[in-house]
């Protein structure tokens, strides 16, 4: 399966670069009896449905022209946005999230909390700094990145 991901990544990257898009994530998974090739794309300012359709058409054509077929079994191709509350997986994801509202889940509590939501203000190799609201007071916390179980963009209400 990793060779499928690598092959598709190699195929889709120039397509995305031609349109000033970038690859957010790619997965090839089996759900029930069906296989799915999911390609998550984005661009500065956000991706549109038309952008997804364009990449889907171009990638589908590119996949059809590869010999030998990198995906011999039947599969569904899905090209989409990673979503408004997308996970932060790679370093670039964290870089793009600076000055954005994020949700952080920790492995262990810090100051009695395992979950924080706030604005990511600083980022280094070892830690992040988050501005968050504690009841009615603005506070700042610096969290060791190794203590983060999960991070994603969040919608502020």
UniProtKB/Swiss-Prot annotation:
GO terms for biological process: ribosomal small subunit assembly; translation. It is found in: Cytoplasm. InterPro entries: Ribosome_maturation_RimP, RimP_C, RimP_C_sf, RimP_N, RimP_N_sf. Its main location: cytoplasm. Coiled coil: none annotated. Keywords: Cytoplasm, Ribosome biogenesis. GO terms for cellular component: cytosol. Belongs to the RimP family. This is Ribosome maturation factor RimP.
């Amino acid at each position: 399966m990793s060779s499928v991901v690598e092959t598709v990544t190699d195929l889709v990257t120039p397509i995305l670069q031609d349109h000033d898009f970038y690859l957010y994530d790619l997965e090839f998974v089996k759900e029930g009896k069906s296989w799915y090739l999911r390609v998550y794309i984005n661009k500065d300012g956000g991706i549109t449905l038309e952008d997804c359709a364009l990449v889907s058409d171009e990638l589908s054509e590119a996949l059809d022209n590869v010999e030998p077929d990198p995906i011999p079994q039947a599969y569904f191709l899905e090209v989409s946005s990673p979503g408004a509350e997308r996970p932060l997986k790679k370093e670039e994801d964290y870089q793009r999230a600076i000055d954005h509202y994020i949700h952080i889940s920790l492995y262990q509590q810090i100051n009695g909390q395992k979950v924080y939501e706030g604005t990511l203000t600083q980022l280094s190799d070892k830690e992040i700094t988050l501005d968050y609201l504690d009841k009615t007071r603005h506070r700042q916390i610096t969290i060791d990145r190794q203590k983060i179980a999960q991070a994603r963009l969040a919608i502020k209400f």
